[in-house]
């Protein structure tokens, strides 16, 4: 499955547009990750635990979107948009939403 943020795939013209496909993943903030992230922020480092969690959530959302596209008979998803939203009381959760257009290319 080809997946891109661009509206076209060079050398692979779109033969048919199948519709919008989406994927979502929600992760909860862990108190230990928060503690270590705060310490890292104080000393100027990166919050690796959060970065891994974000990457995992993004992969889950992308896989969900690809699965929807396959069910429609697509061989590619173009125009992918990735959004991040903070949710929940005290901003305790993070949602990753992805969307794109399922297509059949040559």
UniProtKB/Swiss-Prot annotation:
Belongs to the UPF0145 family. This is UPF0145 protein azo0572. It comes from Azoarcus sp. (strain BH72).
